[in-house]
A protein has these predicted regions:
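Gly/Ala-rich beta-loop-alpha elbow adjacent to hydrolase catalytic centers
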Residues: 110-115, 119
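A conserved short beta-strand
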Residues: 128-140, 159
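Short, hydrophobic alpha-helix immediately C-terminal to the catalytic nucleophile
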Residues: 38, 90, 120-124, 215
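A domain-start/cap signature at the N-terminus of enzymes
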Residues: 1-23, 48, 226
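Short beta-strand immediately N-terminal to the catalytic nucleophile in serine-hydrolase-like folds
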Residues: 106-111, 135
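The conserved beta1-alpha1 loop
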Residues: 26-30, 136, 164
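Serine-hydrolase catalytic machinery in alpha/beta-hydrolase-like enzymes
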Residues: 10, 20-101
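The feature captures the conserved acid-bearing segment of alpha/beta-hydrolase catalytic domains
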Residues: 140-211, 215-221
Length: 226
C-alpha cells in the first residue's frame, strides 16, 4: 500500500502488480479502504488498482448543492461537490496515476452513502469515469432524481451499480424514506437509456456490512472489465 495526502485528504493506494489495469476511486471513511480491498481479494475479481480517499468533509465535498439539515440533530449540506471534484480530477487522480507502472485501462468511481451520491453526480461533470457504484447511496437527496432525469452525462458509462439495505427506507424521516423508490426509478431510467445497470437489495439497514457491500459493487464493476 502507498499512502499520501493532498490537502486534508488522505489517499491509500493499493496498486495492481499487472500493467494497464482499471483504477477504482473510492470515497470512504478512515481505513475502510483496506477492509474493502481485503474483501475483494476474498472473492474472485480481475486485477485492479484501488485508490481510497478519506479525510472528507462529507456534507460539503460529496453534496452537489446546499440543503438545510434533514433532522433536528443533523448538519446542513453545503454543496461542495464541484469544488472537490476539481481537486479529485486536478490533483488526486494525476498523483495516483503517477504511482502506477502504466496507464489504467479505465477508471471507475465508487462510494457509500453520500459517496454514492457523489459517484453518480460526477458522471454529469466529467467523462473520466466509465463505471460507477453507488452503494447505499444517498439518492434521497432533494432534487437529485430530477437532475438526473433532465441532464446528460458527459459520457455514457459502461456499467452502473446501485445497492441499498432493504430496511433503509423504513423510517419516519420524510427525506430518507424516499431512498428506495428514488434509487429504483433512477436505476430503471438508466436501463431505459441502454446502460448496463444493476440494483441490488441487501438485508439490513444503512450501517451494516459496509466494506462487503462496497466490495460487491466494485466486483460487479470489474466483471467483463474490458
Amino acid at each position: 500500500m502507498i499512502s499520501f495526502s493532498i490537502g486534508q485528504k488522505q489517499i491509500s493506494l493499493f496498486p495492481s502488480t499487472l500493467p494497464h489495469r482499471p483504477v477504482i476511486y473510492l470515497h470512504t471513511f478512515g481505513k475502510e479502504g483496506g477492509a474493502v480491498y481485503r474483501a475483494l481479494q476474498e472473492i474472485y475479481c480481475p486485477a485492479f488498482t484501488l485508490a481510497a480517499v478519506s479525510g472528507l468533509r462529507w456534507d460539503h465535498d460529496m453534496t452537489p448543492w446546499a440543503i438545510p439539515p434533514i433532522s433536528p440533530n443533523d448538519t446542513p449540506c453545503t454543496g461542495g461537490a464541484q469544488e472537490y471534484l476539481g481537486l479529485l480530477v486536478g490533483e488526486i487522480l494525476p498523483r495516483v496515476e503517477q504511482n502506477l507502472s502504466s496507464a489504467p485501462s479505465w477508471r471507475g468511481i465508487a462510494g457509500y452513502s453520500l459517496g454514492g451520491l457523489f459517484a453518480v453526480y460526477s458522471l454529469y461533470q466529467t467523462d473520466l469515469f466509465s463505471r460507477a457504484a453507488s452503494v447505499s447511496g444517498s439518492l434521497w437527496f432533494p432534487s437529485i432524481k430530477e437532475y438526473i432525469f433532465s441532464h446528460e452525462m458527459k459520457a455514457k458509462p459502461r456499467r452502473l451499480y446501485f445497492s441499498l439495505g432493504n430496511k433503509e427506507c423504513k423510517t419516519r424521516n420524510p427525506y430518507l424514506k424516499t431512498v428506495q423508490q428514488n434509487t429504483q426509478e433512477i436505476y430503471e431510467f438508466y436501463r431505459s437509456q441502454g446502460v448496463d445497470a444493476l440494483f441490488q437489495l441487501n438485508p439490513g439497514n444503512h450501517f451494516v456490512h459496509a466494506p462487503e457491500r462496497i466490495a460487491a459493487g466494485i466486483g460487479w464493476m470489474l466483471e467483463g472489465e474490458h
